[in-house]
């Protein structure tokens, strides 16, 4: 019996050519392609502050480190989601609570988040996470109101949602714009809308958060005038995306609308055949 994969990347000649060109260049990492890719993500999402990472999981971890999440901090996540966010928050010692999801969308709802707060008697909520399953963003105004009411951070796990839109007060906004949330996480794993092999990104509402995460992403290093002269000003890690992956991402994102249309057509076929 033939193995049927639940997802597969779409790679064409332009992606291969972009990778080869980068392999022949002077930079395989920390080069210009990473910055160019981040600019493309910013343009696609309408967010000024985009920071690439070597995976979506690293993007969540980097955000958690930037926020200094610690033992006893209260976090709410949807009970349908990839295990990465639960693993990271648990590893850091946070109290992780699971909000129920709507049986129509498979997503946590504002009511289920508030119900979780009341049921678990959470006095101080540090952060809640939403995940638009299949790229369908819902209840944005209500989630925004929760963020304001409880004075907490709102992280959007938008790994399914690159290229999606949502409506806020009758105005169309882009997924990942961070106009109403604090952080938006993207993944560029092969099954996502575009791929960089492995890769991810964080979009930020606040420039200060962006600058701190940028330091944490690369060993806490601050470069001086001469490239060999630098200081290490905080404990950081290596969560950087490489230039070859970024070059493929730049090529892929040019076909984002085509990729989304293909997925929409497949979804329509499922709805038709599974009536």
Where are these regions (language model features)?
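Active-site phosphate-binding strand-loop segment of PLP-dependent enzymes
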Residues: 104-196, 201-203, 207-208
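Short beta-strand->loop structural element characteristic of the AMP-binding/adenylate-forming
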Residues: 79, 95-105
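Conserved coil-to-alpha-helix start sites within the AMP-binding
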Residues: 80-86
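Active-site region of PLP-dependent enzymes
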Residues: 160-172, 180-275
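Phosphate-binding glycine-rich loop
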Residues: 27-74, 88-92, 98-100
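N-terminal "arm"/small-domain region of PLP-dependent enzymes with the aminotransferase-like
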Residues: 1-28, 32
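Hydrophobic residues in well-ordered beta-strands that form the structural core
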Residues: 77, 98, 154-156
